[in-house]
């Protein structure tokens, strides 16, 4: 679809900036287009918890005034000036309710800003609102939200994934130009896959966690959800980097990710395909599209190598133990402290995870569970290090199945762990990965992911950008008139 034939809210970041710089559109027009889309469709999609309409329009008017005064120079210090975005509700936003979709934090107004949202604010981005999620990020469908369940814009009888499901749905439904989410083990890539958009899970420590309500502190990674890999690269340029407020951030330079394709080409890279990621139980539609994608890339000139890696079942066990243990520790700080209004207790999923975590950390069981899980985690990290001596990148399906019907997750206590089985290993190892659409099957999106060595964002983004230059899958968006019957 040509840029000038799109509705304003359908534009990418790069397209929006081009038109803003040419004076073809204003930030107010762009912001109103997104707000109008929210008004029209969000009563069915339910992506947003809070819409900051007045603030967004105020910021848009301010952006237009700066552009009027400074012209093209306005973007020198504010590279996202005038661009509206959505933000997952576990990022602290000063003066704006931040709930993590939990009744525990309902009414909580943070007195400070997260590093990520502060960087976006400094870059001139405009906050449209806070998006729904699984409560405290405990889930892969948004069904554990204490408020409501977000629906997949491609088919509102299906889940958008989670825990960043609200952000992914908002991007897919063109209710924002881009969004911000967080991932512990699939919470960016999973929703991106099921909603047919692009999602970047940065290396652990590449982006600051300061001001993000913690789930599992050793794997939590903030990152962008957008319409293209190029847009994700632009956002990563802004939010990545060392932060003195987060001691776990990497003290290494941030490359200009938009220039990554100048250094890398898919045709000169060796890409590994772990047989353990392909030989697992994949839904027929997913397997068909993955095989088509591999054949397409081979025809393009990509060199593939089959890899023999650790079975994914180990990652499921390790992640389940470590995540529950860290949840138990992190949520203990909230119990009994009045953050907001009178509220209900923790939801069922949060209680389940805290109890299991308390068990694995308790005397007599620590060595049997938590300590052993940490040892196996080291083996997983070493397994990836060995693989990356043989290949430059790893390619795999992002999700093993198509977006399931709302309600399916309630039938399995390990729904999220099984859905995220292809993402958990790289999350445990702290590796970067980008999920990109590779087609649709029976009207639902299918996605692949490029996984790279730690701190190789430039490499995975280069692969994703080139992939999207040679196909059009990322240009497909849901027909909301049909799916929502508006």
Q: Which sequence ranges carry the predicted segments?
A:
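Short glycine/serine-rich loop/turn segments
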Residues: 80-222, 276, 325, 396-414
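Conserved hydrophobic/aromatic pocket- or pore-lining residues that grip, position, or stack substrates
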Residues: 34, 56, 88, 120, ...
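Structural helix-boundary/capping segments
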Residues: 40, 122, 173-179, 184-280, ...
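Short, basic, low-complexity termini and linkers enriched in Ser/Thr/Gly/Pro
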Residues: 3, 65-77, 257-268, 484
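An N-terminal boundary/leader segment
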Residues: 1-55, 299-301, 476-486
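Serine-dependent amide/ester hydrolase catalytic core
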Residues: 15-18, 35, 265-266, 277-279, ...
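Long amphipathic alpha-helix in the N-terminal Rossmann-like dinucleotide-binding domain
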Residues: 54-61, 124-125
């Amino acid at each position: 679809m040509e840029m000038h034939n799109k509705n304003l809210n359908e534009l990418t970041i790069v397209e929006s900036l081009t038109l803003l710089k040419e004076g073809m559109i204003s930030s107010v027009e762009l912001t109103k287009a997104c707000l109008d889309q929210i008004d029209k469709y969000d009563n069915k999609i339910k992506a947003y918890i809070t819409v900051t309409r007045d603030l967004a329009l105020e910021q848009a008017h301010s952006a237009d005034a700066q552009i009027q005064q400074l012209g093209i120079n306005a973007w020198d210090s504010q590279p996202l000036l005038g661009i509206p975005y959505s933000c997952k509700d576990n990022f602290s936003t000063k003066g704006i309710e931040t709930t993590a979709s939990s009744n525990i934090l309902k009414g909580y107004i943070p007195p400070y800003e997260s590093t990520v949202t502060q960087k976006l604010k400094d870059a001139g981005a405009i906050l449209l609102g806070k998006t729904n999620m699984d409560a405290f990020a405990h889930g892969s469908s948004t069904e554990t939200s204490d408020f409501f369940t977000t629906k997949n814009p491609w088919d509102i009888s299906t889940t958008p994934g989670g825990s960043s499901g609200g952000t992914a749905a908002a991007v897919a439904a063109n209710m924002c130009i881009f969004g911000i989410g967080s991932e512990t083990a699939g919470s960016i890539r999973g929703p991106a896959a099921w909603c047919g958009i692009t999602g970047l899970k940065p290396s652990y420590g590449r982006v600051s966690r300061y001001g993000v309500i913690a789930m599992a502190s050793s794997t939590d990674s903030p990152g962008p959800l957008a319409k293209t890999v190029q847009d994700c690269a632009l956002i990563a340029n802004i939010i990545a980097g060392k932060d003195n407020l987060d001691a776990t951030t990497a003290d290494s330079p941030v490359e200009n990710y938009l220039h990554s394709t100048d250094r890398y080409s898919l045709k000169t890279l060796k890409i590994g395909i772990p047989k353990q990621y392909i030989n697992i139980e994949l839904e027929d539609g997913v397997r068909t599209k993955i095989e088509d994608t591999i054949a397409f890339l081979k025809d393009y000139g990509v060199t593939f190598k089959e890899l023999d890696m650790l079975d994914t079942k180990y990652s499921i066990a390790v992640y389940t133990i470590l995540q529950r243990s860290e949840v138990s520790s992190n949520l203990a700080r909230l119990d009994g402290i009045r953050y907001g209004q009178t509220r209900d207790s923790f939801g069922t999923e949060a209680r389940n995870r805290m109890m299991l975590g308390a068990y694995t950390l308790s005397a007599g069981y620590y060595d049997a569970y938590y300590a052993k899980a940490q040892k196996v985690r080291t083996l997983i990290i070493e397994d990836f290090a060995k693989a990356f001596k043989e290949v430059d990148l790893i390619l795999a399906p992002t999700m093993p199945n198509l977006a399931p019907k709302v309600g399916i997750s309630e039938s399995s206590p390990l729904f999220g762990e099984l859905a995220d089985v292809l993402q958990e290993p790289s999350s445990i190892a702290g590796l970067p990965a980008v999920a990109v659409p590779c087609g649709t099957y029976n009207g639902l999106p299918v996605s692949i992911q490029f996984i790279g060595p730690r701190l190789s964002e430039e490499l995975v983004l280069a692969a994703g950008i080139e992939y999207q230059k040679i196909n059009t899958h990322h240009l497909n968006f849901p027909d909301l008139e049909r799916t929502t019957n508006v």
